[in-house]
Amino acid sequence: MKKIVALVLALMLALSMLTVATAETANPVAGKKVAYIMLLPSATIFQMWKDSCADLCAALDVEFDFYFCDGDFNRWMDTINTCAAAGYDGLLVSHGNQDGSYVFLKELTEKYPELKLVCFDTQFYTDGEYQKIEGVTQLFQQDKSLVTVLLDEMIAKFGEGVRLVKVWRGPNYNSPFDRREVGWQEYEAAGKIVTVGEIQPLQDSVDSANSVTAAYLQSLNREDVDGVIAYYDLYGQGVYNAIFENANFNGEAGEALPMASVDIDQVDVTNMQTRPDIWYAAGTTDWTLNGEIAMRLLLLELAGEYGVDVVEIPGSAILASALKEDSTVENLGEIAGETYGNLSYLSVADWMPADLLHK
């Protein structure tokens, strides 16, 4: 009789352990609703981000929406407010500007205390100091490194004191540009680079970057500049077109003017393959992986497993000379350095897909 009782107790214990294990691995985010809200216009890299977010959400039965705000900060704030009021469980918000984002998002979290937030490339800054919002994870590219890896390549090509033109919008247009500017200023202060001039597109578009760069080149002597750095690849496409269309800078009369840009998409890869003497390099991270990193952080918050305040992903230089004939924006990991596509930045949990969606 004692043996029977012991067997029954052992069976009950095994079943209880199985029940606990099953509960522990149950999906805690099924049925949740989240959105990705980007300040900037849609671009290939942001679509890569969005698609990886959508794939992960689909795998975990999470409803996913996305919104691009075409560089309009008021529209970005309105979209966030609308989603919060509509009962979204979590928001992944991207590229808020330095001045207004902290106050706005802090008030949002106070008004909707159950709403979970992950912020990408968005600094919390007010009254001359960087701030923190309790319970909100900030994910960044190491924006400074996205510029400095390009500056390092220009220095390797031309030596210290290389003369460069900078293409950006700022200061305080958006947080990523301001963070990239830190790297530029450090190199300039150290005498590693010399700023020949600055170009500021009027809009976040290829056409705007093309027109302002074309006008600027008319006032510039080729012998007075070594290269151009664009803080955003959309601007880079406009810069490339302006150089390509100008006989004094495209290689028809002397050496072509080399340029490099932050971020990358398929248009950039094609241009780098076509004219590596013009589009010399790009500084980037793996945008497909970035989206999954960010969404995993948000889903962890929704599951009550918040663990970190800040995550930073280092940049890699993609050299035109390293591209293969079959290189695309999707397979850059084949030719990029080890910092590109580093899976160590991915959060994991028992209830998340064990086989990572993006490797």
Briefly describe each language-model feature range.
Residues 30, 168, 286-287, 293-359:
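Hinge/cleft segment of the Venus flytrap/periplasmic-binding protein
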Residues 45-59, 146-150, 175-194, 208, ...:
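Short, solvent-exposed amphipathic alpha-helices that sit
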Residues 1-33, 63, 85, 107-114, ...:
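Short, low-complexity disordered leader/linker segments with a strong preference
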Residues 106-145, 268-274:
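Flexible loop/hinge segments that line or gate small-molecule binding clefts
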Residues 28, 136-165, 209-212, 263-269, ...:
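Hydrophobic alpha-helical segments within soluble ligand-binding/sensing domains
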Residues 58-69, 164-166, 188-206:
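Short beta-strand elements in bilobed, periplasmic/extracellular small-molecule ligand-binding domains
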